Amino acid sequence: GNDMRHTDLSSINLSHAKLIDNDMRWIDMSYADLRYAKLTGNDMTSTDMRYTYTRDTCFEDCIIPMACPSDGAFIGWKKARHCGEAVLVKLLIPEDAKRSSATGRKCRCDKAKVVEILTMKGNIEVEFAVSVYNDSFVYKKGKVVCEPNFCEDRFKECAEGIHFFIDRKEAENYLP
């Protein structure tokens, strides 16, 4: 393989490319097109893949650390709606929850406890919120929410699961 560390590949079209057994640490691949590419056995630790197109990309045997902790309970944040207004939901992802992240910062889990729900303006606490994508998925303070159809494939970023970010600011800035 090749030493590709610190290379700027932002906005590059690598669709259908084959990149095998390379050292791809600290590469900027933001906005790159990797659709249908075969990336096998690459070390992609600390690679910036924000807004990268990865439809049907093969990441077989690649080293891509998850954005969320692989073990233990932790806090996550997501954007939802309360009476038509954007709110932030603070989630406690339990130790036994399934969790994943693809190549970016957005994470998913199969269950979480709703710790608090805050308005975007004024940080006022509210009792419930609904999903931005599914009005029947309701978050209630103090209750556990579950996604029974959680998709185990971590590289399907927008698949079934409770979507969240580790960092509150990322959730605040997220535009669904």
What is each PLM-predicted segment?
Residues 153-175:
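Extended catalytic/binding region for NAD+/ADP-ribose chemistry, centered on the ART fold
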Residues 1-86, 99:
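Tandem repeat scaffolds
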Residues 21, 41, 109, 146, ...:
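Intrinsically disordered, low-complexity segments enriched in glycine/proline and serine/threonine
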Residues 36, 64, 142-144, 169-170:
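Short linear sequence elements within intrinsically disordered, low-complexity coil regions
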Residues 70-152, 159:
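Non-catalytic interaction/regulatory modules that flank or connect domains
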